Amino acid sequence: MAYKRVLLKLSGEALMGEKPYGIDPAIVQSIAEDVSKVVENNVQLAIVVGGGNIFRGLKGSADGMDRATADYVGMLATVMNAISLQDGLERVGVATRVQTAIEMQEIAEPYIRRRAMRHLEKGRVVVFGGGCGNPFFTTDTTAALRAAEINAEVVMKATKVDGVYNCDPNKFKDAKKYSSLSYQQVLSDEIAVMDSTAIALCKDNNIPIMVFDIFKKGNISKAVDGDPIGSLIS
């Protein structure tokens, strides 16, 4: 395996599959099976999950909600996804802990950096829910922050496209895929792969970002192996 400690960023939409809303149990099971293969190879894996399949703070704000309130609702959506993911992982025999940035002791541990790292060292998967606990920050930024905190070697951004393009491949047939690109190129060209705060955090801490297609079976293992299946930002 190319990497020994990995932060996997899963969008909420990844858990939705073909559904218009919510969580597709079959997709969760497929992701869990891929993750189990990674853990079997003694890779320490932490996961940050988004909430866009249930509620997106920015959209709530655009629809008239107070932005901070909308973001807090979005944070709760990420916890719902984290618990669902934990259930899927434990069904395939992967010991999993959920840690949340906002305390909810009846259903998850509070986020404690040292405890999270100890879980990883013991071979458990740690799923981070609740974003970073503050409004106005995306779950991509949370992924970059947690990766830096737990000393992850890479951020794996699992998404619905197979890499980073110079324009939307779903809209433009001549869209060019990058096999690799720099943090600065992403920032200066305003390439919409992650928000600028997340990119800058990874840049400042020398954490590469691998962007790949989550819906292709086995891609998580391939990405962790270092296979060139997506786009590498470094």
UniProtKB/Swiss-Prot annotation:
Q: Which Gene3D superfamilies match?
A: Acetylglutamate kinase-like
Q: Which organism is it from?
A: Prochlorococcus marinus (strain MIT 9301)
GO molecular function list: ATP binding; UMP kinase activity
Supply the name of the protein.
Uridylate kinase
Where the protein is mainly located, per its record? cytoplasm
> Which segments of the protein form a coiled coil according to its record?
none
User: Which Enzyme Commission number(s) are on file for it?
Assistant: 2.7.4.22
List the subcellular locations.
Cytoplasm
Quaternary form? Answer: Homohexamer.
Activity control, per UniProt: Inhibited by UTP.
